[in-house]
């Protein structure tokens, strides 16, 4: 599948997402395409959950006088003791640098610290967890405060 994005002008980029649903090792892989160029973004495999990883949201964050940021949000459902039960969310952030009819990306996910991934549900000993960055609006609020 593909998602059109407006980074510098209308629909100038797209995220291409392909998934392999093999029983042995399902995965999802994402690329950013623009200016006749494709760049690998990320790849997620099953990682022990009950269902394969899903790319649930893609967006661009713009801040005046700053490079745009591509946001990707993945989720995976986990279930049943002795595992945690709920949804694991994974956030990726990429700064997009424009240069001479080309572009490059810089992975800035580490700026989230431990907040780049988390459980929204219950762990194996019954403690409840709420992951705060499980939607684009929450991620953009975080970027409003922290993207310098």
Where are each of the predicted segments found?
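Beta-propeller blade termini
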Residues: 1, 6, 52-63
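Acidic/hydrophobic-patterned starts of short beta strands in beta-sheet-rich repeat architectures
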Residues: 1, 11-16, 61-74
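Acidic, small-residue rich beta-repeat scaffolds with periodic aromatic anchors
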Residues: 78-148
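Structural motif
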Residues: 2-5, 23-31, 76-95
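A short, structured loop/turn motif at beta-sheet edges
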Residues: 59-69, 95-102
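Residue-level signal for glycine
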Residues: 37-38, 52, 100-103
